């Protein structure tokens, strides 16, 4: 695994050829990491719980991905459920949602893979084969 990357002036790591954000205890993240390793993909590993994404990173990824913002939420997570976000999110602005996501990496759907021109949220092998 190569640990090279370029950090932009504002601290956002978007110049990484590929950054892999995951929670090591998550079985989906483990499966995704095995896929990356088996396919000899170089990436920078980032523990999403210890080093959660910033508002600026999330905003950039959201815009680059073309996905609805709700796709960035870990809707099956305990924190999402305990905060009753299913009912609260529809009334929140995008800015409020992005700020909330940035408060705790466990709110973010994982894994997240970012590259120079793509963002993938969740592990779908067919999509990863196409984009990575």
Task: Report residues per predicted region.
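Local sequence-structure signature of Cys/Sec-based thiol-disulfide redox active-site neighborhoods
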Residues: 16-34, 44-46
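A short beta-strand-loop structural module common to alpha/beta enzyme folds
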Residues: 42-52
